[in-house]
From Swiss-Prot:
Any single GO CC term annotated in Swiss-Prot or TrEMBL for this entry: cell outer membrane
Intracellular or extracellular location(s): Cell outer membrane
Keywords: Cell outer membrane, Competence, Membrane, Protein transport, Signal, Transport
GO BP annotation list: establishment of competence for transformation; protein secretion
Family: Belongs to the bacterial secretin family. PilQ subfamily.
Lineage per the UniProt record: Bacteria, Pseudomonadati, Pseudomonadota, Betaproteobacteria, Neisseriales
Protein's recorded name: Type IV pilus biogenesis and competence protein PilQ
Naturally occurring in which organism (per UniProt): Neisseria gonorrhoeae
Quaternary structure (record): Homododecamer. Tetramer of trimer.
Pfam families assigned: AMIN, Secretin, Secretin_N
Amino acid sequence: MNTKLTKIISGLFVATAAFQTASAGNITDIKVSSLPNKQKIVKVSFDKEIVNPTGFVTSSPARIALDFEQTGISMDQQVLEYADPLLSKISAAQNSSRARLVLNLNKPGQYNTEVRGNKVWIFINESDDTVSAPARPAVKAAPAAPAKQQAAAPFTESVVSVSAPFSPAKQQAAASAKQQAATPAKQTNIDFRKDGKNAGIIELAALGFAGQPDISQQHDHIIVTLKNHTLPTALQRSLDVADFKTPVQKVTLKRLNNDTQLIITTTGNWELVNKSAAPGYFTFQVLPKKQNLESGGVNNAPKTFTGRKISLDFQDVEIRTILQILAKESGMNIVASDSVSGKMTLSLKDVPWDQALDLVMQARNLDMRQQGNIVNMAPRRAACQRQSLLTSGKRHCRSGRAVFPKLPIEIQKCGRIPQHPALDNADTTGNRNTLVSGRGSVLIDPATNTLIVTDTRSVIEKFRKLIDELDVPAQQVMIEARIVEAADGFSRDLGVKFGATGRKKLKNETSAFGWGVNSGFGGGDKWEAKPKSTCRLPCRKQHFAGARDFSGALNLELSASESLSKTKTLANPRVLTQNRKEAKIESGYEIPFTVTTRSGGGNSTNTELKKAVLGLTVTANITPDGQIIMTVKINKDSPRQCASGNNTILCISTKSLNTQAMVENGGTLIVGGIYEENNGNTLTKVPLLATSPLSATSLKHSGKNRPPRTADFQLPPREL
């Protein structure tokens, strides 16, 4: 009987706890919608308070589990099924402390959450670079319970290949067939959220880590180290959470040799609470510490006056005169500042002198500071300003304990950081507009590239922010110059060559005429004429032989030719440079030249080397909108033979461009070009005879030559 009664009472307690949990906030509706980029949005509606969930992702089977603390479920249907390529089913269950939504997926996915009004939006999409995971008999997930059992029974956690919901890098969802457990690196991630107490909560998931982390504090940094837990470089990340208005400003997860290090950057006064929910899961809560405010403000209690009663009756009297009379009546020493001025009218009878002084102070907005038997009187605004300066100076001295941390510089040279105007504490004008305070100093250690700053915590924090802004890698630009030279050659020749040969025997006769004839009359009876057999135009001499009767042969040959040529030359120097840094590259020859100079009474001969190079000199400036401004000089020189009188000497043919231009990143800009064209026509002919209509074509030679040349200079810069 007692056992049954105990069970009934326990059941009532459980029901009461469930009712109280549900009253904190219930999930009333779940809706699913699609986005164009293959994303799904699961909209979870609440009736009261909204709880931002915490959860995890499993890849085998593909699930997303979300836990809502101190939340109940008020839904008629707690299992929702969908015919979708990504989302297959949503199951809702609850126990005494929380509610869980399990999103069953058809393929590995990832998620992100956002609070909008009385709803929590869950964005689901496929994991990047996912690979179907092989079966792993060593680790199995718990089978899904039926709908009715899930709604009533408490749920259990079975995590397989857990990855963080906010994955900064593209992580693979499964290992190879030989791997039976995921590596710790793929299960290491961080998440940040803000609770109702304005505290920053950092959740660290490192499932492959079995020990306890080492926690240390260095000024405003909390350093959590996981020994012998290696983090790949691709998973290193940094979260800027200053906009959440918590003591946490920045959270950084990085690799340090074989360890993983979590650095929490804080500000103000805070206290740390760390918890370990499960092996590999750690929660760090940074709470703002409440400060005890100094008592101050306006005292609303009624004033009491105990001074000797006096009577005053003045009309349009100086304030200083009234203060002098009150000083005599009270026996105190009153010192009024130069800014106390004006007149007033008083008519007081049997009033304590301290009450009269208080009335004057209120009427003229004066303030009193008493030190012993001396009272300082001044306008209230000036007195408040002076007091605030004194208070701030005391607070600065009280809270400005000097510290001297080491600030490592990773990219820039530490010698360049103090050259920044904000760090120059050598102010000769007296107007200190510097970052270092009057008692601060900066030391440089070039060996370790480290700054050692001695100053207050607030100044050190400003130093850290400034170094974060300055110690960044410089932007780089690949500058490429294309020098394109094209030449078209065209020539045409037309002419005729002809000739004749003949032989004749003559008996006791002489030739009628002869031109260019080798004639001879010897012992024989032969006469022989031998003109040149051919004549190629233009002919300087005409050859012809004749006789009264002869026989021979005529030669006639037509000469015609036409040539067409196209050449293209591409020169392509390229150089990589940093932003606002000059870069230079060149390739070519150094040609010796003999130079004669006059010195004294004679001449001296020296040999000088002149460059004939293909070169590029450029300075790039990247603008904030992505444009690139280039100051560029391009040279393309080539040696060639030149005629100097009757001699041939070596000279240099140059093509040069010097300009400044702006082009978008990845674009191509033609910054200049040269066009040359030489037209030549030649004609050689026989005088007089070549003008005859019958023989004009055969007694002249004509030629045409037209070789145009072009050179273009192109710049296609590309930011890396």
